Amino acid sequence: MTDTTGRIPLWMIGTLAGILVISLIGIFFYGSYSGLGSSL
């Protein structure tokens, strides 16, 4: 990657990835706590 101008900033990708991971973990633990995660 020579230049990131005009492309998605790396910090934005990291932020979105972090939010996605936290959301997936939160949903997984919430499902497990609710008893719905047993099917996973």
From Swiss-Prot:
Entry superkingdom: Eukaryota
One Gene Ontology cellular component annotation held by this UniProt entry? photosystem II reaction center
- Is Translocase there in the keyword field? no
Q: Which organism is it from?
A: Cuscuta gronovii (Common dodder)
Assembly and partners are described as: PSII is composed of 1 copy each of membrane proteins PsbA, PsbB, PsbC, PsbD, PsbE, PsbF, PsbH, PsbI, PsbJ, PsbK, PsbL, PsbM, PsbT, PsbX, PsbY, PsbZ, Psb30/Ycf12, at least 3 peripheral proteins of the oxygen-evolving complex and a large number of cofactors. It forms dimeric complexes.
**Where is this gene product found?**
Plastid membrane
One Pfam family, short name: PsbJ
Whichever gene encodes this chain, its name is: psbJ
Regions crossing the membrane: 8-28
Q: Which UniProt keywords apply?
A: Membrane, Photosynthesis, Photosystem II, Plastid, Reaction center, Transmembrane, Transmembrane helix
Question: Highest lineage ranks of the organism?
Answer: Eukaryota, Viridiplantae, Streptophyta, Embryophyta, Tracheophyta
InterPro entries attached to this UniProt entry: PSII_PsbJ, PSII_PsbJ_sf
Q: What is this protein called?
A: Photosystem II reaction center protein J
Please explain the role this protein plays, according to its UniProt record.
One of the components of the core complex of photosystem II (PSII). PSII is a light-driven water:plastoquinone oxidoreductase that uses light energy to abstract electrons from H(2)O, generating O(2) and a proton gradient subsequently used for ATP formation. It consists of a core antenna complex that captures photons, and an electron transfer chain that converts photonic excitation into a charge separation.
Q: How does it sit in the membrane?
A: Single-pass membrane protein
